[in-house]
């Protein structure tokens, strides 16, 4: 995979043949479960742990950090905006949840979101400084709205998501 190759060559050299310091990147699970290794690989958002070199076209592989998030260093980005958006939108369970067996499959599919940011990288409406929280928030809202029982918190979330925004009233 791309992650296995990253920094495995010693010494690491740039295009001019100069020795460079190892590239900083994040990973945790190495098995497509955490999303920490999300990056642009040949200009496409992918998880580096599940991208195999033989599937990439061309003799050159270009690795870049996801561009919609603040850069920390090399291929490391700051995804904290994803968690801040969930806090701002009150997306958590506050009361006991009843799991309707008929909604198991959609809930399972929504729980597969790794919050890696790949979907937001290609979303024209998302920016780290913008008001649109993106798919990550929508997936979490779906889970909350389908699980939490009647409560003040649920009513507040429903009101938030069904009320027109100030932009919609123009």
Question: Where on the chain are the PLM-derived regions?
Answer:
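Signature of N-terminal electron-transfer/Fe-S-associated modules in redox systems
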Residues: 1-160
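Single conserved hydrophobic/aromatic residue that forms the stacking wall/gate
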Residues: 161-170
